[in-house]
Amino acid sequence: MYDVAIIGAGVVGSAIARELSKYQVNACVIEREEDVCNGTSKANSAIIHGGFDATPGTLKAKLNVRGNFLMDELARDLDIPFKRNGSLVVCTKDQDRSGLEKLLEKGTANGVPDLRIIEREELIAMEPNLSDDVTCALFAPTGGIVCPFHMTMAFAENACTNGVKFFLNTQVDTIEKNGDSYRISTLHTDTKNKETFEAKVVINAAGVYADVFNNMVSENKLHITARKGEYCLLDKDAGTHVSHTIFQLPSKMGKGVLVTPTVHGNLLVGPTAVDVDDKEAVNTTASGLDSLAATAARSVKNVPMRQVITSFAGLRAHEDSNDFVIGEVKDAKGFINAAGIESPGLSSAPAIAEMVTDIVKGLLPLEKNPDFVGTRKGILRPDTLSLEERNKLIKEHPE
């Protein structure tokens, strides 16, 4: 029997696994896909948000700011590509400046440091390609960009190093209370073999399917809506078109279409925001991609959309409460939700991991792992090495 079983190996599930591995705990992660980071975590804006948009007092606000704070140390220890490039929320001539002032108030209440509103003259010096209609912007210097793939893999690999077991190609079919534990029935999607797991504590980090698993064990039903966002990724030749992450004023559907550099030197434009019934609907559409160019032009001019090298879509897990749903389920002792993790979920993942681990510590007698290894060497990319460095590597590893 496992002490803890985590459902879902996205960035949240993997971050929780890594945080739990700091303790002497028999834990596993169950993931239906063939690798980690194959759901929501693989198709998003790759942004570490400052934390100014979330409503003060919500979990989104608290955990975004905390997660942002943790990123420098995590990037160093786990070798995660991360850069604090800063973000700008721009206001145009036909918009009300009061929207920026409200964001500034919210961000200040949330504890976001160094926020300020800057005027067009300073803005254009920072970002020459901003639209001619942009009049001012909220500047958040703590905003950043990250690689969600490397971030998730870093958490998962470090968790594995410290003893957490990952079961991939393993689809959860049912979860049942079994005395003081839970019985998790699964199907191995590659072999079609069935396997049953027993765990004292179950952590539900299943993205758009988190409501399905919650509703198997609880009368307190959740409803997760899959909110599709389409993106265009541009060639590295376009990667310097902007240097900051450029947001538009947010709406009830999200933070709007952004234009941002990536940590790999490309330019990313997106997302759209359309609620869909199909939780597997990650297809792109002509109308969605066409709308990106028009909408992005409101904040950034001359975005070189002819240099698009690929397009993709991802699904955000929107819960009806409009906040993260994190905590032990009242009528299902030992079942912990990490549900409704939409934006700013990537930014908040390290802090969500801390919060969930604290909940587990209230359910199980956890002791520190004296052998915990807190660092990890990232994936080597030969294309980033000099000729001398590549030759040295070849000599060291001729195989």
Q: Which residue ranges define each predicted feature?
A:
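Dinucleotide-binding Rossmann-like beta1-alpha1 core, especially the glycine-rich loop
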Residues: 46-126, 135, 256-257
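Conserved Rossmann-like nucleotide-cofactor binding loop
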Residues: 12, 35, 209
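Glycine-rich FAD pyrophosphate-binding loop
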Residues: 22-42
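Flavin-dependent oxidoreductases
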Residues: 15, 175-180, 184-270, 274-285, ...
